[in-house]
């Protein structure tokens, strides 16, 4: 949805989750343990050779040290590692600084602490949610598109539940509805319908 919105507005799309996934992928490649190698992970976070490039379709190409890792950072192994490394305050501080550098011009930013921590002063903030089963089915379909295989729905639902729990209870940048954000339940709405609703809110604020 954020990609589609950015395309409609004619601005860059930034997925802050991709920065954590990129760090997690680099950590996995370097055989760093997300629990025991905290100090080395923090150093890696501050020096992460990350480039995000917008695609003609409105998406984002992710490059680490010049290598395209757009697909590789979406595996479940990387997702689990990203959930772990994102718990540490020093790593989150490095990632927030990186995200702010990447968004020096007008962008649509997607992320779990975007409106509360990274860009609390953003002029437009939206908090999207959906029924857990619907979220699990959407994630299952995303994994099938990326890798050609469909993991069991129960497994995907459990992974989302685990990730939500970690994010809601972390000490720094927990998952919350940001102050001033408009909540939108997407359970019975398509991506296009949600984008139209968001654009309507933006146009009303501007007029």
Indicate residue ranges for each PLM-predicted region.
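Anionic, Ser/Thr-rich low-complexity intrinsically disordered regions
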Residues: 113-115, 126-134, 145-159, 164-169, ...
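NTP-dependent small-molecule kinase module
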Residues: 63-70, 137, 141-145, 166-207
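Hydrophobic positions on the alpha1 helix immediately C-terminal to the Walker A/P-loop
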Residues: 1
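ATP-dependent NMP and nucleoside kinases share a basic, alpha-helical "lid"
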Residues: 70-146
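N-terminal phosphate/diphosphate-binding loop that engages ATP/GTP or pyrophosphate donors
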Residues: 4-73
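Amphipathic alpha-helical transducer elements in NTP-driven molecular machines
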Residues: 20, 38, 42, 88-96, ...
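Residue-level signal for inorganic ion chemistry
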Residues: 17, 66, 95, 108, ...
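Conserved beta-strand scaffold positions in the cores of enzyme catalytic domains, especially
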Residues: 13, 125-127, 181-184
């Amino acid at each position: 949805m954020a990609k589609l919105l950015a395309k409609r507005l004619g601005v860059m799309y930034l997925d802050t989750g991709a920065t954590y996934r990129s760090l997690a992928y680099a950590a996995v490649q370097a055989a760093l343990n997300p629990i025991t190698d905290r100090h080395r992970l923090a150093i890696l976070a501050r020096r992460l050779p990350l480039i995000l490039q917008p695609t003609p379709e409105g998406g984002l190409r992710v490059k680490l040290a010049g290598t395209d890792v757009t697909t590789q950072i979406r595996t479940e192994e990387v997702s689990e590692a990203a959930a772990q490394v994102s718990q540490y305050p020093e790593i989150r501080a490095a990632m927030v600084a990186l995200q702010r550098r990447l968004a020096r011009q007008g962008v649509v930013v997607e992320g779990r602490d975007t409106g509360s921590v990274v860009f609390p002063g953003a002029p437009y903030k939206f908090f999207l949610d959906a029924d857990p089963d619907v979220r699990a089915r959407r994630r299952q379909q995303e994994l099938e598109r990326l890798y050609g295989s469909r993991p069991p729905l129960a497994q995907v639902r459990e992974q989302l539940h685990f990730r939500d729990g970690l994010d809601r209870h972390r000490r720094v940048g927990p998952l919350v509805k940001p102050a001033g954000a408009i909540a939108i339940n997407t359970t019975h709405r398509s991506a296009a319908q949600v984008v139209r609703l968001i654009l309507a809110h933006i146009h009303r604020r501007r007029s």
